[in-house]
């Protein structure tokens, strides 16, 4: 079933004309919640803390830690990448995503051994780092580390500490694969959870040792778009120009206008365009049309600029 779903996800991405594709994370039921099944040293939560009422982040519970955190069989990303390699057609580049340790730590309950979220993060860091190292060894040439918790709580946390955590996590892959960081403000059940403050992340996040920084922009109405000028001087700026939380399907012309706005702050060779976040909470029909329109809109501007 997972293979069939992956084939469908690949087909949809290719049909839209994407330059880089993934497996659609079809082996996961969430971008990060599935990973707790690979951990030893925790008790999986028996039931969500809230079942009824509107869907939201408080329906995700936390798993108690019972002993040292380990992942003796890895975190599953390598097998997912190998399946993508086997199923993908020639042409588009392949990318794999993995949640970072700070984001993963958010669903685990502190205990005497790991008294706070940062202690849990430090325990998870080598597990994620090992998975990244194994992905590179398996031939993965682009890895996106998802750290939405860092962007959600950047306004109140020590950003230099975030940068140190992130850079130590990706260290085995620096200069060995293209490294991306994804930042957003939450998308569980299509709901945001962060304060949506982008400027507070800079200039500290410019010290992240990545090739591409992906930032949710559409849901903030592009109010902080000028930050991509700073970003593009250090790395590629991947701008979220599709709202994955809305069922309004942006037209190619609207996308083209957003691309033109980005070009006021960053050169074309430093810009990447993507949805704000993953499309796991978006119906397939809407996701397909949004992706197709995104590509068409970008191509309108490419043609205008002779790119």
Q: Where are the regions that the model predicts?
A:
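Domain-level signal for soluble alpha/beta catalytic cores
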Residues: 1-307
């Amino acid at each position: 079933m997972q293979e069939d779903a992956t084939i469908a996800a690949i087909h949809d991405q290719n049909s839209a004309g994407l330059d880089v594709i993934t497996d659609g994370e079809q082996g996961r039921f969430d971008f990060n919640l599935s990973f707790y099944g690979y951990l030893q040293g925790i008790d999986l939560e028996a039931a969500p803390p809230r079942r009824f009422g509107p869907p939201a982040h408080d329906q995700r519970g936390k798993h108690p830690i019972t002993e040292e955190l380990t992942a003796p069989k890895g975190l599953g990303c390598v097998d997912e990448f190998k399946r993508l390699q086997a199923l993908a057609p020639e042409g588009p580049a392949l990318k794999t995503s993995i949640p970072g340790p700070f984001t993963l730590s958010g669903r685990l309950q502190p205990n005497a051994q790991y008294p706070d979220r940062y202690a849990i993060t430090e325990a998870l860091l080598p597990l994620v780092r090992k998975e990244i190292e194994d992905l590179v060894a398996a031939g993965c040439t682009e890895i996106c580390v998802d750290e939405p918790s860092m962007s959600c709580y950047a306004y109140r946390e020590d950003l230099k500490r975030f940068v140190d955590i992130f850079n130590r996590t990706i260290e085995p892959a620096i200069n060995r694969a293209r490294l991306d960081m994804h930042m957003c403000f939450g998308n569980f059940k299509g709901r945001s959870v962060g304060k949506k403050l982008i400027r507070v992340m800079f200039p500290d996040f410019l010290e992240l040792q990545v090739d591409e920084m992906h930032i949710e922009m559409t849901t903030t109405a592009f109010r902080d778009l000028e930050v991509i000028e700073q970003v593009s001087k250090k790395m590629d700026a991947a701008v979220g120009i599709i709202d994955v939380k809305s069922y309004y399907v942006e037209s190619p012309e609207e996308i083209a206008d957003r691309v033109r706005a980005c070009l006021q702050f960053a050169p074309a060779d430093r810009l990447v365009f993507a949805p704000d976040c993953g499309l796991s909470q978006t119906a397939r029909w809407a996701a397909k049309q949004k992706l197709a329109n995104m590509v068409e809109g970008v191509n309108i501007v490419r043609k205008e600029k002779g790119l």
